[in-house]
């Protein structure tokens, strides 16, 4: 069994505890938290399980890493604290652990990552013997292994389009939803996530990963952004009220230009309520979906909807993201220490003999 730490117990961390506990080759050895109110609580309780796992949460990072865990699922947010997240991850890699995380967007395409992100990790790899694999947005397969798999099913490929379509009504991330994405803010508010260059920073690496898999070069990456206001005030269960006139939906594309055309596209359509921007793409059912469309011969379209925690689509997306990460740990522990991306790490098959916490 591979001793595995889950670092962070938010939306992704809860799913990570479940994934590690269910995996037949992993053993949950510790759970790290930053909130003093969570210290001492059982990991099963923090993950919303009915099972006591016998692992008490701690905030003692030094002690956990000194115990020599073989792997760390870093589930703490990097959206609003990227420097801190990088420092945490470098520390774990330097302690010799295999680290898997969705937190560092620039490292999704690690070969082209900025030096200030890449070099500290490589230094930690060289000194400590750990490894790092970053994946998990949209939700870690929708913009890399899935579209590339689908391109292999056709005779010709003209355009690859990856869509995430979500209604944030059920989300429990008010800071990210209101301030990073701008939901409910006045229409003259400039959401940081939509600032020029930020979509490319977050999703450009996945454009380049798909291009690398297809054996083509991306000439440039373009961004297209649209926003719509709410026509009526709406109330959400977990994040409160969003007033009419404030931002209610966004739609953006990150376009990989090949031969002068947008041929690799990552598109997001996000609403705070299903009543907003109904003329934009919608999921076939439910609150959200990930969709990949291959324009070519034949035209191929695949829509995937995942649910967890009582039918919650956002929780389902998180569960598949950490499923990919946790599933990569056994392979990473046998590979050479290094910095890996989604095209390096094989996607293992699941097993039928797992428990279901």
Question: How should each PLM-predicted stretch be described?
Answer:
Residues 7, 11, 15, 84-87, ...:
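Conserved active-site and cofactor/substrate-binding residues in soluble primary-metabolism enzymes
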Residues 7, 151-279, 290-292, 315:
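Active-site-lining helix/loop region of Rossmann-like oxidoreductase modules
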């Amino acid at each position: 069994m591979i001793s595995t730490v889950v670092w962070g117990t938010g939306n992704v961390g809860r799913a990570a505890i479940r994934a590690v506990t269910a995996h037949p080759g992993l053993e949950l050895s510790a759970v790290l938290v930053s909130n003093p109110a969570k210290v001492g609580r059982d990991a099963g309780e923090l993950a919303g399980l009915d099972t006591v796992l016998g692992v008490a949460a701690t905030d003692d990072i030094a002690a956990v890493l000194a115990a020599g865990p073989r792997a760390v699922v870093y589930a703490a947010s990097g959206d609003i604290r990227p420097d801190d997240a990088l420092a945490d991850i470098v520390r774990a890699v330097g302690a010799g652990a295999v680290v898997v995380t969705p937190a560092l967007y620039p490292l999704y395409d690690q070969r082209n990552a900025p030096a200030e992100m890449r070099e500290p990790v490589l230094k930690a790899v060289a000194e400590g013997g750990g490894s790092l694999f970053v994946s998990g947005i949209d939700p870690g397969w929708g913009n890399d292994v899935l579209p590339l798999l689908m391109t292999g099913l056709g005779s010709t490929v003209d355009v690859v389009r990856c869509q995430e379509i979500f209604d944030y009504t059920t989300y429990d991330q008010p800071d990210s939803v209101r301030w990073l994405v701008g939901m409910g803010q006045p229409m003259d508010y400039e959401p940081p996530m939509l600032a020029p260059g930020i979509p490319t920073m977050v999703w450009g690496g996945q454009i380049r990963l798909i291009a690398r898999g297809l054996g083509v070069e991306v000439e440039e990456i373009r961004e297209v952004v649209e926003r719509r206001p709410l026509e009526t005030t709406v109330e959400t269960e977990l994040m409160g009220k969003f007033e009419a006139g404030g931002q209610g939906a966004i739609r953006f594309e990150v376009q990989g230009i090949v031969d002068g055309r947008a041929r690799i596209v990552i598109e997001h359509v996000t609403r705070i309520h299903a009543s907003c921007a109904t003329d934009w793409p919608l999921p076939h059912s439910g609150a959200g979906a990930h969709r990949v469309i291959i324009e070519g011969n034949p035209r191929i379209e695949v829509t995937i909807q995942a649910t967890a925690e009582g039918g919650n689509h956002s929780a389902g997306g998180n569960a598949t993201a950490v499923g990919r990460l946790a599933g990569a740990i056994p392979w990473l522990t046998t590979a050479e220490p290094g910095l890996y991306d989604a095209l390096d790490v094989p996607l293992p098959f699941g097993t039928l003999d797992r428990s279901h916490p």
